[in-house]
Amino acid sequence: MSTLLDIKSSVLRQVQVCPSFRRKTEQEPEVTNSQEPPTGAWKPGDGVEFFAHMRLILKKGDGRQGLPCPEVLLRSGSPAPAEPVDPNRGLRTLTQEEVEMLYEEALYTVLHRAGTMGPDQVDDEEVLLSYLQQVFGTSSEEHMEAIMRVKKAKAPTYALKVSVMRAKNLLAKDPNGFSDPYCMLGILPASSAPQEPSGQKEQRFGFRKGSKRSSPLPAKCIQVTEVKNSTLNPVWKEHFLFEIDDVNTDQLHLDIWDHDDDVSLAEACRKLNEVIGLKGMTRYFKQIVKSARANGTAGPTEDHTDDFLGCLNIPIREVPVAGADRWFKLEPRSSASRVQGDCHLVLKLITTQRDTVMSQRGRSGFLSYLLLLSRVLRFEHRVEEPNSSSWRGELSGPGTTVLCLHGAQSNLSPLQLAVLHWQVSSRHHQTRTLDYGYLLGLLEDVQAHWEEAASLPQEQEESLADSFSAFSEFGLRLLRQLRDYFPATNSTAVYRLELLLKCLEKLQLFQPAFEICPFETELSMDIAAALKRGNREWYDQLLNTKSPREQPGPQRLAGLVELADIIYEDLQLCYGVYASLFHGILKVDFFTLTFRQLERLVAEEAWVLTEELSPKMNLEVASGLFELYLTLADTQRFWSCIPGRESRSLALAGIHTPFLPAVKLWLQVLRDQAKWRLQGAVDVDTLEPVDAASKHSSSAATASLCLSHIQELWVRLAWPDPSQAQGLGTQLSQDMCEASLFYTELLRKKVDTQPGAAGEAVSEQLCVVLNNVELVRRASGQALRGLAWSEGASGLEGVLPRPLLSCIQALDEDLHREAHTVTAHLTSKMVADIRKYIQHISLSPDSIQNDEAVAPLLKYLDEKLALLNDALVKENLNRVLEALWELLLQAILQALSANRDVSADFYGRFHFTLEALVSFFHAEGQGLPLENLRDGSYKRLQEELRLHKCSTRECIEQFYLDKLKQRSLEQNRFGRLTVRCHYEAAEQRLAVEVLHAADLLPLDANGLSDPFVIVELGPPHLFPLVRSQRTQVKARTLHPVYDELFHFSVPAEACRRRGACVLFTVMDHDWLSTNDFAGEAALGLGGISGIARPHVGGGMRPGQPITLHLRRPRAQVRSALRMLEGRTSREAQEFVKKLKELEKCMEADL
């Protein structure tokens, strides 16, 4: 047995997996022109060039949706543009004498260096001297002569600056668990250093000695700090200065004591600062010691009044050149002493007298350091980074060492050093560009040290203020030309701008710190003024370049379009890049400032130009104005899309008004150009798929692209006036509908002139055309929905305007109709084959199996659907399936009508065929839905097959059942009949009372009728002995009242049979001819009072009337009649004869 019955159409199963179609709107396949269209006006009627120009307009607007992101705008990491430099803005040029004096100062610093070098410093004297020779550019002879002069000069006088800051974790000496510490400190000459005889206990020097010590105290100018009561972590922050005789041998000695007596050595030592000279100080100190001992209670051999807490011995030569700022661990006087804790000291070795010309002439160390740093910085920049603007001032080892030595010897504070490096570097930056990060770091150093020291000599503060003013003036000049020196698309330049703004921010922070303010006004106001001036200069230059005012209006228009585009792009950059920098750093609203200024300027130009060009309106002018308006509208919307900002107060508000005539003219041309474009696309279309992945041809892609471009253009247009937008949108939607229908008409004409290949059952060209129609239907629907315009305050958000919705629905219906027409044309080529296979099933002998009879049809359908699946998109495949399904049902119905008096196997075979086709077309859910398959003609065919299998009486019963079903479906068109019916069980009779009728059809010429009612029971074989009865005729009325009662002697069981009913037929009595049929109604007997069983509901009370709607027999009622017509039995023929007579009456009425 064949297995074709199990075929579920593998083709149909794949339908759900395949995409409907793939729109290729990136480019039009048939357009291969690689050249961009000219920027001038397009030629009238040249659709390709027009839409190419429109694509450029749309492409220009692609980047204008929403607010820009900085990461999108920053596109280049190339070096930043070079900033302007001016050699005259640096420090003044020194005279030759001043250079020689500075050279001598630097050599003197190196030759008389003292202290310990750091790990990054150079301790080689020859290297340092050679470095200075290179910095000053002297010859070897001049260099040696200068060295000899410096060596003959007196050595400098050294001094040690000591800051006793704090101590921690000291030993507790008092009963309360604390101590009352104070410090005694002084300089120990080399001759006073303690000697340690071999074999004796280790003994360190101390400012106190036991009773056995008789030598004078060796310390010079002993200083003492205040006593800090009850603490183990004292804080002093006291500063002292000690002269140094020999930096190589002298030591700093410091003792920490616990103060216990009212009169102690500490109090006496405070007066030692008044003693001048070591000899006098020693004698005085000895007297103080004796006095303290005499007043104490301890014995001569006991410890002294103040308890020892620790000491420090620091050789002067070990003090770093840059100074020391650290914690020192306290040491005991001897190995037997018990001490703990640390002491924080700040040490710096300086010179107090220098035998140099600059010192002799009163030039301060501040000035000499400034000049030396400037010299070194210029030399290092020239050597290290001759052509770079990213140099961060990294000095070489010798350069750092020389400056460190000079700064320390000149006793410059950290604040002074920070100020000097800023002054020199900021001035040098204006002559040769440095890295702004380096300058920002210098400002941060100044700020940090300023907060600590908070003061400078007035002269130095004024010098710092001058450097701030010079740098701010330089920065403002750069900000005026912001777009030139810091282009927003260059990430390197933007980063330099960010650092420059941070430098200016630091300058702002210094304003309240100066007694003499370096700025006449607030720096932020100066910055805003510089930005405004820069905006105006940039705009004027751009206007003179792109659209000079002396040119005629039409020539200026193209330039103004370009200018407006540049301004929009500039505003994007301002918002996406510059705005956050200026607002976040300086609190300057750069974007608002720039937008309002540029928007006002470009609006003024646009108003003037539109007034000039309005009388000269033509296609070229309209094109230019249309493009100009789009950019201006984008500019206005760009402002309004920023939260909290409205565009009503802008100069561009209302700018759409003068552009309306140009926009209308341009949209009119768009309609004509669209048709030309579609015509050209269809002319060159070969009605073949674009590629293997697509099922539509090139013209459909072009049509879809055109519709999409029109919709995108409308979105770009976004006309602000609701009433005007409705008119423009309505016209544009009608133009799009017209273009879509125009395209389908062109396709139909092309198919008519290019028929498919001879003998081809399924035309590939028709499949492509069908796919084209579907693609355009979807594209047009999507494009039209995108045309939704605002209806003002009365419009609902998200609801399409009514005119647009009507247009969309009408076009969709038209394109659906066109698709069904093409589908019918496509399936008509299969009609002959389908009829042949249906006839094969009809003529198959009863001896073969049903599936064998159906096999050829299923195989044919499977092959054709495989071809259709490859050629059609899913939507069109479904259309073809539906058409084929209807075609098959009609073919089977025709086969059934053509065969009479056939065997039951014949109808069984077609019943099998119908179910096999349902399974085939459903394809396990991948094909047509079952509810669609089992509807319409399927029901009619299934009923035909069922009736053909029924007996004559079953067909008659079905006839009456159909009448009963018809009652509830018919509307009140033919009037109403009210009756009352019940069964009298005692007499075994049925009582039927005809009460009255209403709203009957007027069947006579006078507009009335002469109605009477025929009452009969059916089906006849259930009531063979019962004759029909009739009421009296009621003349000239449409609302007769009968009130007549009829009895029918019938058993109750007969009334309960299937199809048992009372049939009321209303006739119009005609005296001269055949009576006319007015309507009929049927009432089932199974539910009337006396017949209905208790579980059915108890029936109806005898007195309850029933109103029946009159109707005429419908098609499903006549199907049973047609079935009976083919029967040859007497019962069937008599029944049909009776009904035929009734139908004649009905036809006469029509």
Swiss-Prot record:
Domain MHD1 residue range list: 626-747
Membrane topology: Peripheral membrane protein
Biological process terms in GO annotation: dense core granule maturation; exocytosis; G protein-coupled receptor signaling pathway; modulation of chemical synaptic transmission; positive regulation of insulin secretion involved in cellular response to glucose stimulus; positive regulation of neurotransmitter secretion; regulation of behavior; regulation of dense core granule exocytosis
Binding site for Ca(2+) 3: L1003, D1004, D1068, D1070, D1076
Annotated residues for binding of Ca(2+) 2: D1004, D1010, D1068, D1070
Function: Functions in endosome to Golgi retrograde transport. In response to calcium influx, may interact with SNARE fusion receptors and membrane phospholipids to mediate endosome fusion with the trans-Golgi network. By promoting the recycling of secretory vesicle transmembrane proteins, it indirectly controls dense-core secretory vesicle biogenesis, maturation and their ability to mediate the constitutive and regulated secretion of neurotransmitters and hormones.
Subcellular location: Cytoplasm, Cytosol; Recycling endosome membrane; Late endosome membrane; Golgi apparatus, trans-Golgi network membrane
UniProt entry keywords in alphabetical sequence: Calcium, Cell membrane, Cytoplasm, Endosome, Exocytosis, Golgi apparatus, Membrane, Metal-binding, Repeat, Transport
Location, primary (coarse class): cytoplasm
Gene Ontology, cellular component aspect: cytosol; GABA-ergic synapse; late endosome membrane; plasma membrane; presynapse; recycling endosome membrane; trans-Golgi network membrane
Tissue occurrence: Prominently expressed in brain structures including hypothalamus, amygdala, stria terminalis and periaqueductal gray (at protein level). Expressed in nonneuronal tissues, including placenta, lung, pancreas, spleen, and testes. Within placenta, expression is restricted to the syncytiotrophoblasts.
Top-level taxon of the source organism: Eukaryota
Binding residues for Ca(2+) 4: D1070, S1073, D1076
Gene assigned in the entry: Baiap3
Pfam name, any one: MUN
Binding site for Ca(2+) 1: D174, D180, D258, D260
Region (Disordered) location: 22-44, 193-214
Record-linked CDD domains: C2A_Munc13-like (cd08676), C2B_Munc13-like (cd04009)
Species, as recorded: Mus musculus
One MF term in the entry's GO annotations: SNARE binding
Protein name, per record: BAI1-associated protein 3
